[in-house]
Amino acid sequence: MEYFNVGKIVNTQGLQGEMRVLSVSDFAEERFKKGSQLALFDDKDQFVQEVTIVSHRKQKHFDIIKLKDMYHINAIEKYKGYTLKVSKANQGDLQEGEFYYHQIIGMAVYEKDRLIGYVKEILQPGANDVWVVKRQGKRDLLLPYIPPVVLNVDVPNKRVDVELMEGLDDED
């Protein structure tokens, strides 16, 4: 079965079995909602078990979750550093123009017909995502995911068309 990373358990939260998760999910509210089915993977990326979310809330930059049948700090401390993943079957359907992060990673980024590089990761610093583009012989380009910059995302052809605003590429 294919799984996709949605977050890392970075610490416990209180004594009642809550976990502090650093989310890397494109749809965190949906992914961590009550009843969601996720999989737990250890620090060697080995499957541990399926888990069910029983509660979720946001606190600062973290998602605080509680898992079914894990109601005390002693039951969850061993999971610090583990990864939460969603199975492909549990990802859900997307609306037109939506896509998952794992579909974007590795896509070729073009301005007109000039290859700029490839998306290597996606950051979530605030109001909008920032795509990190790996370039040949240059520093990585930080590309804000906003309409004037990202013109088209063609998932089947693994291509992103952009228009670099003045000052966005400091190496040109």
From Swiss-Prot:
Quote the InterPro entries the UniProt record gives: PRC-brl_dom (IPR027275), PRC_barrel-like_sf (IPR011033), RimM (IPR011961), RimM_N (IPR002676), RimM_N_sf (IPR036976), Transl_B-barrel_sf (IPR009000)
User: Pfam families attached here?
Assistant: PRC (PF05239), RimM (PF01782)
Please give one Gene Ontology molecular function term for this protein. ribosome binding
Its main localization is cytoplasm
Disulfide pairs here are: none
The family note in this entry says: Belongs to the RimM family.
The name under which this protein is listed is Ribosome maturation factor RimM
Question: What species is this protein from?
Answer: Streptococcus pyogenes serotype M28 (strain MGAS6180)
Its gene is: rimM
